[in-house]
A protein has these predicted regions:
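Catalytic cysteine-centered active-site loop
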Residues: 43-90
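Active-site-adjacent substructure of cysteine-protease-like catalytic cores
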Residues: 84-140
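Stable alpha-helical elements in mature extracytoplasmic
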Residues: 24, 29-33, 46, 63-70, ...
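Noncatalytic regulatory segments and standalone regulatory/sensor domains
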Residues: 2, 124-194
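Short, solvent-exposed alpha-helical surface patches in non-cytosolic proteins
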Residues: 29-34, 195-262
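Active-site-adjacent structural segments surrounding the nucleophilic cysteine of cysteine proteases
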Residues: 1-59, 145-152, 216, 223, ...
């Protein structure tokens, strides 16, 4: 099957800003969602348009995109539903059922990138996963031994790799996978008054970092100050498990000077 891939690495995007950087350098989040919507047959959205939505809804942060925030804003607009998981079996079942997924690649297993990167999985055949990569350049998947051995390039922006490799590449991100499907139209129901259910959905949509080294570098200074001050102690089992929202809040407080010792 042929796929249409939208690339953030078109030369024209070097001069178009996305927050404090350019679309070319930092719009893998919006671009991966554009590719997901196109693959599902829901919408043909340009990368700049999706970037504008990311900025307007607060998903754009220094150094990256908060995918949960972007999906929450985009879902009603483009008529899709989504959920999160870090389980390979759930990703595989979702793809085989006709859904697509955004994979959040990390920095510990540099399959899709040398640092954090979003890509879009569109198909599973057995345990072979077809992935669309918006950050494309010549020789990307022959540049390292890992990529040469574990990735097959089908066309520009279209690769296959194993389910196992997808798991390794996303192991230091929580959630690893954002599973996206066409929305099913249901009768309107009264607004939920079940705060427990609402809170569970909110928690499921949140991104968590298990260890300090998993936290994006632009948050690390502020989080380190909170740890040193004894304000963050983790889960007690060796994991920090800090949410992206808390990282953002601490970073804002640090820029205000609130975290500096008096």
């Amino acid at each position: 099957m042929a796929y249409t891939v939208k690339f953030q690495t078109e030369s024209k995007y070097k001069s178009i800003s996305y927050g404090s950087n350019s679309i070319y350098n930092s719009a893998c989040g919006p671009a991966s969602l554009c590719n997901a919507l196109k693959a599902l047959g829901l919408a043909d959205v340009s990368i700049p348009t999706m970037c504008q939505l990311a900025v307007s809804c607060g998903a754009r942060v220094d150094g990256g995109t908060v995918m949960a925030t972007l999906l929450k804003a985009a879902a009603p607009k483009y008529h899709f539903c989504y959920r999160t998981t870090s389980k390979n079996a759930e990703l595989l079942a979702h793809l085989k059922a006709g859904g697509v997924a955004i994979l959040h690649g990390g920095s510990s297993h540099k399959l899709f990138s040398n640092s954090g990167h979003f890509v879009c999985a569109v198909r599973a055949s057995g345990e072979t996963i077809t992935v669309l990569d918006s950050y494309w350049y010549a020789g990307k998947y022959t540049s390292t031994k890992l990529r040469r051995q574990k990735v097959k390039v089908l066309a520009k922006g279209v690769i296959t790799t194993s389910l196992y490799q997808c798991g390794l590449a996303t192991a230091d991100r929580a959630p690893s996978y954002y599973l996206i499907s066409k929305a099913i139209q249901k009768p309107q129901k009264p607004a939920s008054s079940n705060t427990t259910t609402d809170k569970k959905q909110e928690d499921d949509d949140m991104t968590y970092y298990k260890k300090f080294e998993n936290i994006p570098t632009w948050y690390q200074t502020a989080v380190k100050k909170a740890i040193d001050a004894g304000a963050l102690n983790g889960t007690g089992n060796g994991e920090l498990n800090v949410s992206e929202d808390l990282c953002r809040t601490l970073t804002v407080l640090d820029k205000m000077g609130t975290l500096d010792k008096k």
